[in-house]
Amino acid sequence: MVTIRADEISKIIRERIEQYNTEVKIVNTGTVLQVGDGIARIYGLDEVMAGELVEFEEGTIGIALNLESKNVGVVLMGDGLMIQEGSSVKATGRIAQIPVSEAYLGRVINALAKPIDGRGEISASESRLIESPAPGIISRRSVYEPLQTGLIAIDSMIPIGRGQRELIIGDRQTGKTAVATDTILNQQGQNVICVYVAIGQKASSVAQVVNTLQERGAMEYTIVVAETADSPATLQYLAPYTGAALAEYFMYRERHTLIIYDDLSKQAQAYRQMSLLLRRPPGREAYPGDVFYLHSRLLERAAKLSSQLGEGSMTALPIVETQSGDVSAYIPTNVISITDGQIFLSADLFNAGIRPAINVGISVSRVGSAAQIKAMKQVAGKLKLELAQFAELEAFAQFSSDLDKATQNQLARGQRLRELLKQSQSAPLTVEEQIITIYTGTNGYLDSLEIGQVRKFLVELRAYLNTNKPQFKEIISSTKTFTGEAEVLLKEAIQEQMELFLLQEQVEKN
């Protein structure tokens, strides 16, 4: 017979009491009322915050956007096909954030900062909120350093500075993405981190951009954030903020960053879809009332930081697509008013073979001229005026048959200036090469050539200067001014190359 010893039992009970931990855990939960179209209506979740992440029973994450009296409207970060009516939802107490680190360079990720390039996980020890406040006035300084795009038309007449927001706007198929990718290629060796955000693009288009960057060695300093056309609207809406958070991480570490949003029209459409499904009242073009704030809070995060914060910068190049050149539509006017200028790409110019198809007349950079180097200012000062006068004359000349000699000369000069602005895709030029090109055109050295010979001559002239007069580039890069010595070298090179070129042309004819 087993004897029960009271002291042993009391000892066990005492130990159990000592081990007992009175931890009270309150979990904010709710119940799914209805789900569909990427939206869930939740009953409960009484203390949820606006923008808080919520977790469904089967693992899907959502963001609480609509806080109503009887229920909460949640947008899903996934298809939500496994979510059932009546299942439970719990609030996480966290606002959307992503991991950030140097390891993201060279990778392709989605809006949740998860890699989608099949090259394994990305290690990161820090994290940043996807939505963080923009730097205040005291935290900034005015734009003063240039960000070269490698495109003559932009760097000479619509200059961009580090920390600026410059809109690229135009119809579909006018080369907007090409301008952006050329700018990324031109940052090679400039110590600039680039972030390319693809929103609602075709997967094949994104793959093509990534391929171009890899071939040219530009992926080493680039992060691609991609949410393609088949992604849920929530993720397309979040992608630009994810890109901005990654760029900010580098900006606050005293680095220079360039971020491209391709394109914000698609983000606005995704946000419109979410808002209408959440039953928010529609406004102009069925967009919700806060669509301006959607873009302003994103683009205000681009800045040139003050010297106290390390002078890092984040330059934003948002892209907006217009419908048959209508710049007065809702989203284009909104983004134009937020940014520091716009580069307008014209379908007519593109179809006429002028590429990049930049309409210089209505493109503008509001703060970039302060960042332009002195050498470029000296050379390109009268280029915009001459092109504007040429465009006016050309329109007038269509109605007149007999033109005086001066007008004919001005038209001939204008045609050659327009020719020198043409560039092949993925062939950005250095500032020194741009100065050579513009000086040759504005000083009449191309007037004696046929229009068809202009580009060939300029390519040969740039190569000739690189090999025979390397000191020209040294003067420009060290002094940042177009000195008398540099001008003498350039004039000599133009005359020597012109003689060679005309001889070659004569030999080819014979």
UniProtKB/Swiss-Prot annotation:
Keywords: ATP synthesis, ATP-binding, CF(1), Chloroplast, Hydrogen ion transport, Ion transport, Membrane, Nucleotide-binding, Plastid, Thylakoid, Translocase, Transport. Produces ATP from ADP in the presence of a proton gradient across the membrane. The alpha chain is a regulatory subunit. It comes from the Eukaryota. It is an enzyme of class 7 (translocase). It is found in: Plastid, Chloroplast thylakoid membrane. It catalyses: ATP + H2O + 4 H(+)(in) = ADP + phosphate + 5 H(+)(out). The gene is atpA. GO terms for molecular function: ADP binding; ATP binding; proton-transporting ATP synthase activity, rotational mechanism. Belongs to the ATPase alpha/beta chains family. It comes from Glycine max (Soybean). This is ATP synthase subunit alpha, chloroplastic. ATP binds at G170, D171, R172, Q173, T174, G175, K176, T177. Its EC number is 7.1.2.2. Its main location: plastid. Coiled coil: none annotated. It is a peripheral membrane protein. F-type ATPases have 2 components, CF(1) - the catalytic core - and CF(0) - the membrane proton channel. CF(1) has five subunits: alpha(3), beta(3), gamma(1), delta(1), epsilon(1). CF(0) has four main subunits: a, b, b' and c. The record marks S363 as: Required for activity. GO terms for biological process: proton motive force-driven ATP synthesis. GO terms for cellular component: chloroplast thylakoid membrane; proton-transporting ATP synthase complex.
